Amino acid sequence: MRHSDVPFLNDTVTMESATEILERHRALSTSFGSEPLLVLPDGRVLDLATGYIPLLSTFTTEDKAAKGLRKGKESSAPPVYFSLNDLLRDNQALLLSGPSGSGKTTFAKHLCYSIAEQIRAAYSPAVDKVPDVGAAEWDLKGLRSCYFAVDDDQDLEALVRDTLPSLFANSSASEVDGVVVVIDAVENAEQRFSSHIENILTQLLSSPNKRHRLILLSDPTASNELVVPLTVARYNIKPLSSAQRRDKVAPLMPAEAIVDIASGDSTSNPALFALAFEAKHPGDQAEVLLDAWLVKVNDADGSIAENAFHQMCMEISNASVVEPQPPGVELDWPLLARSRKIKRLLVARHLSNLSTEVAVEFFRHDPIRTAEILQSLLIRLREADDQKFDILAQALLEDDDITSQRAALLLAKAGKICAQLEDQISHQALEILREGRLPFAERQDAASVLSRFGDPRDLLVLAEIPASLVTLGSNTHVNSQPMHELPIHTFRIGIYPITVGQYATFKTATGRQWVSPDRDDPYRQNFPATDVTWHDAVAYCGWLTSRWRANGTIGEDEQVRLPSEPEWEEAASSGRNTLDLAGCLYPWGTEWRSDASNSEETGLNQPCAVGLFPKGASFHGCHDMTGNIWEWCTTLWGEGMATPSFGYPWQDDGREATEASPSLRRVLRGGCFSSGRLKANCTYRGSLEPGGYWRGNGFRVVVSR
C-alpha cells in the first residue's frame, strides 16, 4: 500500500520544475513533524518531532578501522556505532536495510522534517558519544529534501525519468546547497531495480554538487538480493538498545514504572517499543505484548485482528480464504495498528483461531510476504496448542519444495520441538544449502538451524590438488606482479575454512586463549573461526596433526599445516590462471558474480556460515575462497603493509620460514566480508602481523608429506 500522504511522480499532468518539486516536498516534509508517532499509557500522543528516537547502524568504528588490515587487540570497551546521520555525512548514496518495524520510514520522515525546518540532525543522547572519526556532525544547513515511496517498478521508473534529472541537475538556486532524495520500499521495484539504480546514480554522480544525497530504504531479505553498484554504501539499521529505550521512557513516566516498560527483548524493534509504551508492558515476547495492547485498546471482539487479516488477504490477492467484508464496513484503526509490523502480528493472532488448512493456504499463496505472519502464528500455537501446532507443522512440510523449505526455517524458530520434527527441519535446511536456490538471508537461517541442531556436513573434508605447473599473480595490482609460473607438489586442502565449532574443540582440549564472541554461540558453530592469530592457526594445525595421525585420518609421514601462498592460489583458481589473463580472476571464473561470495558487495558486514555460496566454489570444490574471511598462509610478507619485502615472483628465499621476527607480517589471502571485488579474488595479496587478530580473518588447513 502506498504511504497515504506521499506524492508520487506524475501526480500532475504537467512536468514540474525543480523549484516546484522542492517547494511541494518542503511543505510535505514540514507536515511529517506533526504526524502521530507514540501513544503514552494515559492516551497522550507524541508526534514525530517529539517522539522520534535517533537510530544507529550496525557499523562500528572498529569496522571502519578494519577496512584496512590491522593488528587486533582485546578490549573491554563497548563498540561505538555510527548513527544513520554519520553514514549520510560520509556517503553520497546509501542503502539502509531493516526489518518491518525497524524505523526506516520514521527515520526518513524525521530527516526530511529536520531538513525542512533546518534543525540539527538527530543524534541519540543515550549513546555515549558520536564516533570519533575526525569528522563533524552532518550539517543540514542549506539542504532540501524529497521523500518518495514506491509501490512497483512503474513508480521507480517514473521517478528516474521525470523527477530526479530535474532535481539533481537544476537545483541551483542560491538557497539550495544540495538535495537529499529518499526512496522508500525499493524492494517493491525489485524486478527492474538494477537498471533503475544505474540511471539514478548516473544522474547523481554526474552532478558537480557533492552535497546531493540518495537514500534507499529496503527490507533486509530483499536488499541482500538487490544488485547494487559499489558506489552505493550498504548498511543495516541497529535495533534499539536498552539505553535508547530508557532515555525515551524516563522523562515521560514515573521512576518506579520505568523498569517495567519496554524492557523486554522484543521492544528493541521500534514498532514493538511503541506498543509496549502504550500498553505499559515489558514486551518480552511480541505475541504476549500484542495481546496486552489489545486489552488496553478495548478490542474485546477481536475486530482489529480480523480486519487486519481481511486487509492482508486483499493485499496478497488471496480472497479464497476470507469472507468478503460487508460493504461500507470500516474499522477505526488505533494509531499503532497502522504499522506493518503490528498488522502482521494481528493477522497471526486471527489465524490462530482459524483452521490449519486456512493457515497453510494463506502461507503457500505468498510465502515471502506472509513469512513473518506464519512465524508469529507458530509461536502462538507452540505456546497454546501443541496438537494444532503439530498438525500445522506436518501440513507445511508435506510437500518437498521450496515453500516447505521456507516453512522449515520458520518452524525452527518457533520454540522447543520434538526430535522427529527436528530431523525433518534439519533435512530441509541441508537441502537449502546444497541447492542454493533460496535467497542468501534464508540460506543464513538454514545454516543457523544446522548449527543449532548439529551440522551433518563433513566440514573437515579435504580436496586433492594434483601436482602441476601453475600460473600465479595478475596484472590488477602491483603486489601481484609479475605473473609467473611455478611447479607445485600434490597436496590436500580443506574445502571449508576451520569453523568455530572445530576451533572451540581445540581450545577446550588445549586451554589456549581465544577472545572470539562466537565460541559459545550455538547458532554460529559452522561460521569460520575468527579472531585467531597466525600463531593460533599454526598451533591448531599441530594439534590436528596429532589427532589425525592417532585416528588414522593421515599417515605418520603427513602433517596438517597452513597453505603456502602458491598452494592457496592454486586451490582458489583451479589452474585457470594464464600468463595472458587480463583482469581479476575469481574461483568461478573471470566475470564478477554478486551471488557467489560474502564480499563488500553483499552488504552483510560480518562473516557468515561456511558453504553458503555454492555458486562461488572453485573447480577444485573449495568453498569461500574469496570473501567471508581473510585466510592465513605460511608465507612471509615483510614489515611494511603497503609493499611486500617478499614480492612476486615467488622464490625459495626463506619466505616459508616457520620462525621469523614478530614484526614480519604473514600473508593473508582471499579478502573478507568488507573487501570489494578487487580484493576478494584469487590473486590479491594481503598481510597482517602474526600476532594480529580480527573478526575478519581465519584459516583453512592443508595436508601434505
Over which residues does each language-model region extend?
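Extended hydrophobic
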Residues: 111, 150-154, 220, 226-228, ...
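Conserved Walker B catalytic segment
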Residues: 188-210
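Hydrophobic repeat-domain scaffold segments
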Residues: 270-274, 340-459
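Surface-exposed recognition segments
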Residues: 479-484, 519-522, 576-577, 582-584, ...
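Charged, amphipathic alpha-helical interface modules that flank catalytic cores or transmembrane segments
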Residues: 1-91, 97-99, 106-113, 120-138, ...
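Active-site microenvironments of metalloenzymes and redox enzymes
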Residues: 487-597, 634-643, 703-705
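Conserved P-loop NTPase "ATPase switch" module shared by AAA+ and STAND
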Residues: 175-194
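Post-nucleotide-binding-loop coupling segment downstream of the phosphate-binding loop, primarily
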Residues: 106-178
